[in-house]
Amino acid sequence: MGDMTNSDFYSKNQRNESSHGGEFGCTMEELRSLMELRGTEAVVKIKETYGDTEAICRRLKTSPVEGLPGTAPDLEKRKQIFGQNFIPPKKPKTFLQLVWEALQDVTLIILEIAAIISLGLSFYHPPGESNEGCATAQGGAEDEGEAEAGWIEGAAILLSVICVVLVTAFNDWSKEKQFRGLQSRIEQEQKFTVVRAGQVVQIPVAEIVVGDIAQIKYGDLLPADGLFIQGNDLKIDESSLTGESDQVRKSVDKDPMLLSGTHVMEGSGRMVVTAVGVNSQTGIIFTLLGAGGEEEEKKDKKAKQQDGAAAMEMQPLKSAEGGDADDKKKANMHKKEKSVLQGKLTKLAVQIGKAGLVMSAITVIILVLYFTVDTFVVNKKPWLTECTPVYVQYFVKFFIIGVTVLVVAVPEGLPLAVTISLAYSVKKMMKDNNLVRHLDACETMGNATAICSDKTGTLTTNRMTVVQAYVGDVHYKEIPDPSSINAKTLELLVNAIAINSAYTTKILPPEKEGALPRQVGNKTECGLLGFVLDLRQDYEPVRSQMPEEKLYKVYTFNSVRKSMSTVIKMPDESFRMYSKGASEIVLKKCCKILSGAGEARVFRPRDRDEMVKKVIEPMACDGLRTICVAYRDFPSSPEPDWDNENDILNELTCICVVGIEDPVRPEVPEAIRKCQRAGITVRMVTGDNINTARAIAIKCGIIHPGEDFLCLEGKEFNRRIRNEKGEIEQERIDKIWPKLRVLARSSPTDKHTLVKGIIDSTHTEQRQVVAVTGDGTNDGPALKKADVGFAMGIAGTDVAKEASDIILTDDNFSSIVKAVMWGRNVYDSISKFLQFQLTVNVVAVIVAFTGACITQDSPLKAVQMLWVNLIMDTFASLALATEPPTETLLLRKPYGRNKPLISRTMMKNILGHAVYQLTLIFTLLFVGEKMFQIDSGRNAPLHSPPSEHYTIIFNTFVMMQLFNEINARKIHGERNVFDGIFRNPIFCTIVLGTFAIQIVIVQFGGKPFSCSPLQLDQWMWCIFIGLGELVWGQVIATIPTSRLKFLKEAGRLTQKEEIPEEELNEDVEEIDHAERELRRGQILWFRGLNRIQTQIRVVKAFRSSLYEGLEKPESRTSIHNFMAHPEFRIEDSQPHIPLIDDTDLEEDAALKQNSSPPSSLNKNNSAIDSGINLTTDTSKSATSSSPGSPIHSLETSL
């Protein structure tokens, strides 16, 4: 979003503002400058200028309690004056830009040049008849008409190049379009709670306006700037803006400034929105960033790395989230290393590219030598000046043949297949309730070997209901009759639950008749409020009598306290505190308990032990969560020191203990069975009591009675994995994790430790690939560390969603199984395409190479090769990459990180089919004219008309590919290749479409396609030979792979994948280096793989900037979304520097970059050079941001 957009945006707002000056008591500019202040400075400014926050509310014509009236004209006016809460997106790339990018492909450029030379030479006629003497070297002289047709081949090559470019550009364009749709879907998902006309409503983040009263709570990501009005115990993590890792406590009198993009780590409250969109603190930075990024991009045109631009725009805004930048870098590394598939593919493409280059170079050399020796040595012809153009034409023809071999050798369709497959899967996964945020997560899921799942809400329905209670010395196995409970106890119980729950938690009547009441807010609290209603009491009157503003002090729930307490002032000025929390934790703090008569009696430790045995354990063994409700009274004077938590949260009086049931989702046991069958271990990590957790794990089928497994509590787990010094040891973790199935009473740190322990373990031969689910703010680290992080779409906090790779829109475990299926399907789709593509490549290269060497001419012409290779492969990648997944995918074990891309079975298929195709093509080439009684096409003069002979070879070749495409649908040696073929209409359409186009090319292609129309019987033979592919496929399937020990596998990532990631850094960068080299165009054939680059770039750009980058339009429609990504954190070795306007720094950076050595376009023009470069450069370019690169300079400048 360039300077232009911003200046328009601002100037428009300023103009409006001056005209509306009198509408509100403060202008946008004033509010904007107010929000730039911090702490006491801000408090002083508010006091001096406005009086207090309430006065600001009055000026903004809003009420701190009722909120805005919410009428359309009022909202519209606010949007006009103060701006809207989104950031103007960057313009998408136009179709023409994409065409221009596709044209940058070096193989295409070489072909264009060759075609133009060929065109030019065909129009140039040397004088005199000596022309005839020149050409005799090669199968006789050409006649006048043939020479005239010389330009056709050149023109045809140019045309097919244009065709290829358009197909590529269209593919990229449609992908961008699709991801934009996905992006807007993510945007609509984001809602925030505001108060309008006294009602609490959820509205999309983009709808928030200045003056709105927003309700904020634990786990929120603030969508706009605002001032704190009231709340309890609110702590904010502002590291995303300031780089300070300490949490900041907010209060009206000390620090009321709340900034967009920061995280609520604890507490709750209300704020009045004062700045939105580009005027909020995040928006201002974002604006600077956008402008800076655009300038950089202009300067960076040379390096042709569109991806780099996205990366650059993202780099500056990182922060050391946990203080330690190194850890963060490691985490980023880990994410990079994640796309195992991308790494394997890049490596494979590079290897194939090398081979292709060598083959094409040899072809050209042999042709040139043969021609010169034959003409000037054997036939002893002098080099005549007038013959030069003819000789040059021969050389150009040889050159075109060489380039053709290269074109065929390079598997352009490969990255395209990945992109299509991922894009297709992501779109379909939305229907299966998986919202994919990082593309490669989809493919990583196919390799998952372990899933660490939360219990609440994922394995269970998260609809809490109290089913047992212990009140007044009696253990009730169902909801007690209210008349059997002492009236005083009952009143205390109702007050304790109604007041000491978030006021946003409510139970509403059902939407449809006969449905269950709706639970809104925290589900455990909903269960307790439901208990109050079941006791035929009502919590609303209690709350209206004691509104939220009147609460004296609140200790919010967090993972350390494991309880929540609220203090209120009684009518006699004394204080009462209500507490609730996990029973074993709260009971330890109780010294009294209410008896049946409602009197408090002493509660000794031995009473507590008895209660645990007789009440809590039986409840837990039924799979219930136990919650204890208690209270404590304090005298009015001296007022207690409320900050001294240890003294306050003690000496409580227990009112009751309830057992809450959270039933297992009916579909979960089946889903877990599928996982286990698919070789995936499911572990449950929960904060619940160990007995509850074990009971639920048995119900889900995670553990089966009588098996050898471990169920540990967090404390015990920590004791076992740490040495005497309290340090975690990997060997100790290795002893535990293989048997561990349930980790109970665990903290988020335990979860992170477990995930890291499993991922770093070298205990098993395959390194583990771990998926994790999380919903809480503090699950962030574990979600980031995991190979795939799943966040809950319904119950998850914004912080968890931001750290995740996939969002489960229905919070359901069975959706994870669908993700596994899709992931494996991506892997299979790519293997299918590889199998098909490599057969085409092997055959075409060998045919062109041997044909050229033996007959001086490639049996498959340049234009035909382009049709086969580029168009057909592009279509084939579409056909094979869109196969829908089936349940059978879940019947085999995960591939793991080291499984080669091309298995032995696939290698058998590739070579087997190549043998069949080569045998037939060479038979046709050397004896075809006798079989069909036609003229031989071998040794034809330079511009001779197309021969039937070579047309038959071309046609047979294409028919064999078509039928082999059907064979390629199965890669595990299955017999029935037609299985489920009609479930994939795209496949059928493409096969039939390709066949139809082939008929048109052969019958009407004429000179441009070097085709001569064929008779019906010749067509029949071609199709018959093609059909033979299917029969031959069955023959190959009969040969047992185990016998073919000599077959090598390919596309394997080296053993480095097995090393824990600390030592991986350089290695990871190597994979990445390959991808980066692809983008830099540093080596001739690397640039020759430029079309691969386009696709990889698209995958990578989407992977990195689908939701994180400014690269995609709308990708930041809401400012909320902008800060929601780790990419926008100032990450640097000196994290604690507030962000400064870095436009000049960025210019420096660009200058530095311009002077840096890799201005590759002119350096490596000779292929041999590039080969040497490859070996010497690796170490240099392997560092992720070499000192000259713009990203590095940006990092250092910040």
From Swiss-Prot:
Cytoplasmic compartment ranges equal 1-94, 174-345, 417-830, 882-901, 965-983, 1038-1198
Q: Which BP terms in the Gene Ontology apply to this protein?
A: auditory receptor cell stereocilium organization; calcium ion transport; cell morphogenesis; cerebellar granule cell differentiation; cerebellar Purkinje cell differentiation; cerebellar Purkinje cell layer morphogenesis; cerebellum development; cGMP metabolic process
Annotated disulfide bonds: none
Which Pfam families does this one have?
Answer: ATP_Ca_trans_C, Cation_ATPase, Cation_ATPase_C, Cation_ATPase_N, E1-E2_ATPase, Hydrolase
Q: Give the domain of life.
A: Eukaryota
Low complexity bias: where?
1151-1166, 1175-1189
Q: Name one GO molecular function term.
A: P-type calcium transporter activity
Membrane-spanning segments: 95-115, 153-173, 346-365, 399-416, 831-850, 861-881, 902-924, 943-964, 984-1005, 1016-1037
UniProt-annotated binding residues for Mg(2+): 775, 779
How does it associate, per the subunit comment? Interacts with PDZD11.
Q: Where in the cell is it found?
A: Cell membrane; Apical cell membrane; Basolateral cell membrane; Synapse
Describe tissue expression.
Expressed in the retina, with strongest levels in the inner plexiform layer, weaker levels in the outer plexiform layer, and very low levels in the proximal inner nuclear layer. Specifically expressed in the following retinal cell types: rod bipolar cells, horizontal cells, amacrine cells and ganglion cells. Also found in the cochlea (stereocilia and outer wall of hair cells) (at protein level). Strongly expressed in brain cortex and cerebellum. Found at low levels in heart, liver, lung and testis during late gestation. Expressed in lactating mammary gland (at protein level).
According to UniProt, the name of this protein is Plasma membrane calcium-transporting ATPase 2
Q: Which NCBIfam families match?
A: ATPase-IIB_Ca, ATPase_P-type
Similarity section: Belongs to the cation transport ATPase (P-type) (TC 3.A.3) family. Type IIB subfamily.
Q: Which UniProt keywords apply?
A: ATP-binding, Calcium, Calcium transport, Calmodulin-binding, Cell membrane, Disease variant, Ion transport, Magnesium, Membrane, Metal-binding, Nucleotide-binding, Phosphoprotein, Synapse, Translocase, Transmembrane, Transmembrane helix, Transport
Q: Tell me the SMART domains matching this sequence.
A: Cation_ATPase_N
Phosphothreonine: residues bearing it: 1094, 1143
**CDD domains the record matches:** P-type_ATPase_Ca_PMCA-like
